[in-house]
């Protein structure tokens, strides 16, 4: 299989240089702003051509694919409509409806797919006492659970932001919701156990580690 080098001009359409990381991310740490903590050895798979490789990362704010050119400059791929899969180091991402999901295998047939949503509130205005009008000044990350989603609230150096990570399922080549209906369909032999679990005033897990453990118990026949 012939592998193209991602740095070839035109491979991903027109390319544009990004702003500096500090300027663009408005003080949000790389671990939050990107789906990987650093640019790593990556491979991109396309729907209409062979794979390509290079040093790359994925931006959580706009789901853009970023990579480093031969001078170490961060570059934004302006057209990635034909990208279906990305691997950076050992992490695998599936692109679905314009969003990258990180894949965490649970079995040969199923994986947890995690989507990160980052909202940098650039329109927030400073209040009279130096805070921001859209959120309080939070120095440490804190977790807020709402609608089954874990939200991390924080104040960046320039603007407040929120970041959430939501767990889905990846099975049969598709991203599907983590819901009672989906689980009953995927585990028909465990319908009664799923119903009993939810009727006992418990909700489906939303943290990655808890979702993985829950699916493993479902698959093995263990008590939920």
Language-model features and meaning:
Residues 1-25, 214:
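Bacterial Sec-dependent N-terminal signal peptides
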Residues 8, 59, 219:
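Residue-level marker of positions within ordered structural domains that often coincide
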Residues 24-74:
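N-terminal secretory signal peptides
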Residues 52-176:
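Aromatic-patch recognition
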Residues 151-218:
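A short, solvent-exposed beta-edge/loop patch
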Residues 218-224:
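A cross-kingdom marker for long, charged
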